[in-house]
Amino acid sequence: MPPSSAAEGSTKRKKGGAAPHLKSRSKNARKLKRSAEDAEIAQLEQGIQAFVSPIDLKQFTQLPLSDRTCRGLKRAGYTDMTDIQAKSLSLSLKGKDVLGAARTGSGKTLAFLIPVLEILYRRKWGPSDGLGALVISPTRELAIQIFEVLRKIGSYHTFSAGLVIGGKDVKQEKDRLSRINILIATPGRLLQHMDQTLGFDTSNVQVLVLDEADRILDMGFSRTLNAIVENLPRNRQTMLFSATQTKRVKDLARLSLQDPEYVAVREPENEGCTPRGLEQHYMLVELEKKLDLLFSFIRTHTKCKALVFMSSCRQVQFVHETFCKLRPGVSLMALHGKQKQAKRLQIFTQFTKTQHALLFATDIAARGLDFPAVDWVIQLDVPEDVDTYIHRVGRTARYTAKGNSLLFVLPSEEKGILEALATKNIAIGRIKPKESKTQSIQNQLQAFAFQEPQIKHLAQKAFVSYVRSIHLQKNKEIFDVTALALEPFAAALGLPGAPKVKFVKEAAKAKKAAAYKAAQQQADDNSGQVKGDSDDEQAERADKNGKVRTKYDRMFERKNQDILSKHYANLIADDASSEQDSSNDSDTSDDDSVSVATTDNDDAEDREETRYGRSAGRRKENRLVGSDTSDSEEDESDDEQNDSGLHKIKSETKRSVMAARGDGDDGFLTLKRADHALEDDGDAYGIGGDDTRITMEQAKADATENLSKRKLAMGQSKKALALAGKRGIGEKLIFDEHGEAHALYELQDEEAFNKQGDAKTQAQRWAEEERERMQQADAKDKELAKEKRREKRRRQKEREKALERGDAPDNGDEGGSGDDDEEEEETGGRAVLAPIDNRSDGYETPDFDLTTEEDEDDDDDADDDDDDDDEAYRAPAPKRRKMAPSAGVTSQPSHSKKSKLEQEEELALRLLAGDA
């Protein structure tokens, strides 16, 4: 066959398909391939079950892995295993739940990706089986990094893998989710697809992996993770990996782990959780000097790769913008959460490939990201906790490489952060900057802020965001916002003054209150140790200082506030009388002397009342007997005033009783003012100097004699009355059948109330009386409504009959004149049912009776009264079309007022005449 024809034949076979013998050969090949895979899978299952981890487990070839996975690892350059990989793979390959903890850069990504590939391969997972493995990452950059590693080591497998993160096209992701076997996602976007994407089924997931598990399980992703786990099957395999692994039972119970195996790479006791090749330093810096030292460090380290962490996105933006204008001589980049996903991915890739660069970033770059050859990690702000510090410094000194870290610490933060790092056995040394190489950039920043409003606005945002980040930190022993020098810090950012931040004042106030409370508690504790204090008193004092006492608490804690002075005086008088009866014969001389002395005191009081008016005497009496009128704010003062008031009442009452006794027995126990009136009595307000009764009006007149007109006007003003609670209070009286006045809402005493029966019986009686009264009133209303309906129906029928006869209704009772309507209006316009219309709905041809002009005038006069009743309810008659007079019909003269029937008859005649 010529070459051309051979070429054509080969082309035809490609278009038409393989030859029959080739089809059979490929079918046999696929069959052999499947049988070989089945044999390999069976061998792997046996090897996994019988595998015992040797002591010298160093290479991946020692593990019972599939040939495809081994080739992928070899192609990616992974031959030797790390400690965490050697300890965890032997457990995870058997299908057990694993909690893995190891230092940063120790190869945790391969420790969970290899079991994912092997488990799905051994279970013959295919495209029709759906989603089989789910890997959740806290950040987008870490998810991208995991996906790239999976592509390298799984290149020989036939699984379909997908990446689902925020910032991507959701519609494009929805179309491909149903065909994915291994999914790597961030929590937020994964939950969004679970809620919105049709056909996305997670009920058959075999493996769940949480990378940086402690970050995913904390409060930031708590609710999202709970919602995701609810949609996953319980018989899955779960693996958790992090540099700072959690052991909290609450977190582990949420994931429904089944007998998890905790795998941790034990470090020597003298080493911490940070990489071995990491040198850690800290520098004591004032807040306003941070940017100067950072810029000086960059100027002196232009041939290195560094990562600078800050606490907020606004700080990253401001420092990146201003330092780029200062041109330090090295490539500067910024990575923070306010950037678009495409920009974040571009910067992540660019910094990974660049040899000498400096990246300003927030904590989104602190976890899991593997930046190659990072020389320095600089922390411009102290991290929130030790775990964050470990993850930050873990971006350098990866695996066996070397690295350095530098932490800028404020003087107020030094003690707290060093103690926190010591709890994790992290040794950090202090270094001092060289003054000769320190360069100030404050003047340049001020010039930038003055020339460009955007830079000034960004500086203000950076200032506020930093202060807010310090204020929101939980550990107040390290982060004290009140200790920050805000004015110098604002000047260091180039601002003319510090922006006003409200929560700084609130924090200062709270700190002052906490210090005062601590001092008060300390004083109470010291006073509680004094001798003589009982346990009850100490407990009561602790209860008072332990909670805030409101005015209601003080009100309910008052004691002896309801003692009646008059009743108590009578009791004391009875005691005094019994004592006098027993000692009447032996103490006559003493009684006389006491009586004379008491009489002199009474005369002195009368003279004082005459000199200063009746009000002075009453004030003096109230001062002696007024224990029930005191309203103290503290319990101790209440008790003291009550006790003193009771002693004064007792002494004064005894003195009055002894003075009231005369020489004979007739004057025994005659009190001078025993039945004096109180302030509420209007008819007898007090007793005068000559034992005469004074009315309330006279007492008020005496009290207002010494007041000026201005004071009197002020006392009667609306404001004064409102403050006294007397404004708007009216006294309403009702008179009974005997002519006696009673208050409108007069209260009965208990005795009078019980005479009428108990409360339940009276309530039932009142309900029955009201029910009966309402029934009677209802019957009257119904009867009245029926009568009105009957009357209206009768008048309507009479009016219709009169119209049928052609007679005008009279103004009497039968015609239904306007007097009845007026009478209805005067009754109050009670609503009644509409009258029943008994006329037929069809049209009735009227009898046309032509009358003379005189008859029409008479009829008009007779119908005026009837038409007046309907004027208010009938609209004016519409204008009728003028028609030409025809032969045989005389034109009728126009009248100002015509009845409705006559107008209809006239219109009918005109229409008939026109048709004729």
Swiss-Prot record:
Coiled coil: none
Residue positions of motif DEAD box: 211-214
One Gene Ontology biological process: rRNA processing
An annotated GO cellular component: nucleolus
Class of the enzyme per the UniProt entry, highest EC level: hydrolase
Keyword rRNA processing: yes
Residue ranges of domain Helicase ATP-binding in the record: 89-263
Documented EC number(s): 3.6.4.13
UniProt-annotated location(s): Nucleus, Nucleolus
Ranges of Acidic residues composition bias in the record: 576-593, 630-642, 810-826, 844-871
Biological function: ATP-dependent RNA helicase required for ribosome biogenesis. Involved in the release of U14 snoRNA in pre-ribosomal complexes. Required for pre-rRNA cleavage at site A2.
Domain text: The Q motif is unique to and characteristic of the DEAD box family of RNA helicases and controls ATP binding and hydrolysis.
Protein name, entry field: ATP-dependent RNA helicase DBP4
Organism: Mycosarcoma maydis
Lineage: Eukaryota, Fungi, Dikarya, Basidiomycota, Ustilaginomycotina
Gene (name only): DBP4
